[in-house]
Amino acid sequence: MALDQEVKAAIIAKYGKKDGDTGSSEVQIALLSEQIKILTEHLKVFKKDHSSRLGLLKMVGKRKRLLAYLKRTDYARFTDIVNSLGIRAK
């Protein structure tokens, strides 16, 4: 259920500020969003996989905290990432 290396590299290239930028908030949010999509599809098939459900909830919480940080520090970047990923955010 982990991201493929090619998918991860494509996300980093799209949302990173420079080559190899894996630590910026936008990249972290985009990577978490992709993992959340994959895990959501997994849980639609395997409804009783409670350990994966717990991991999903942790990822959603982490993404929520990163979005709150980005909203607090740079609102323009926050709106860009939310619109490009199609995330509902308050």
Swiss-Prot record:
InterPro entries: Ribosomal_uS15, Ribosomal_uS15_bac-type, uS15_NS1_RNA-bd_sf. Pfam families: Ribosomal_S15. Keywords: Ribonucleoprotein, Ribosomal protein, RNA-binding, rRNA-binding. SUPFAM superfamilies: S15/NS1 RNA-binding domain. GO terms for biological process: translation. One of its GO terms (molecular function) is structural constituent of ribosome. Belongs to the universal ribosomal protein uS15 family. One of the primary rRNA binding proteins, it binds directly to 16S rRNA where it helps nucleate assembly of the platform of the 30S subunit by binding and bridging several RNA helices of the 16S rRNA. This is Small ribosomal subunit protein uS15. It comes from Aliarcobacter butzleri (strain RM4018). The lineage of its organism: Bacteria, Pseudomonadati, Campylobacterota, Epsilonproteobacteria, Campylobacterales.
